[in-house]
From Swiss-Prot:
TM segment ranges: none
Protein name: Translation initiation factor 2 subunit beta
Domain of life: Archaea
NCBIfam families: aIF-2beta, PRK03988.1
Length: 138
């Protein structure tokens, strides 16, 4: 004898077997900056990892962070060393501002973007939806 199931019960059963991550809308979560203050300097230990995760050049990213914090700094290995004392909240806020301005697509909200230069203007080009938005040069 053959058992017949209705569509809704099959769909419910299939959804229950899927992991929780499938239902999350956000797939792009920036790792928080692992920063600490040492003397009169702030050190971000995982700076290059964050830049690699965003698929952006570490030098350009560092330039943005230093400009936003109004300080000087250097990249040494995988760390960014900033002159001055900055709390982890402020550092993470500046990183999130960078993501919103230079990584996430303004149309679809996906992180699949590249910064391309056409003439003298830099654009944030989305590889997912094809949208282009002019961005400030760093």
């Amino acid at each position: 004898m053959v058992d017949y199931f209705d569509y809704n019960s099959l769909l419910t059963r299939a959804r229950e077997q899927l992991p929780e991550e499938v239902f999350k809308d956000v797939r792009f979560e920036i790792p928080s900056a692992d920063s600490f203050v040492e003397g009169n300097r702030t050190i971000i230990k995982n700076f290059k990892d964050i830049a690699k995760f965003m698929e952006r050049d570490a030098q350009e990213f560092a330039k943005y962070v230093m400009k936003e914090l109004g300080t000087a700094g250097d990249i040494e290995g995988v760390r960014l060393i900033l002159q001055g004392k900055f709390g982890w909240r402020m550092v993470n806020e500046k990183i999130q501002n960078y993501v919103n301005e230079y990584v996430l697509c303004p149309e679809c909200g996906k992180p699949d973007t590249k910064i391309v230069k056409e003439g003298r203007i830099h654009f944030l080009k989305c590889t997912a939806c094809g949208a282009m938005k002019p961005v400030k040069t760093l």
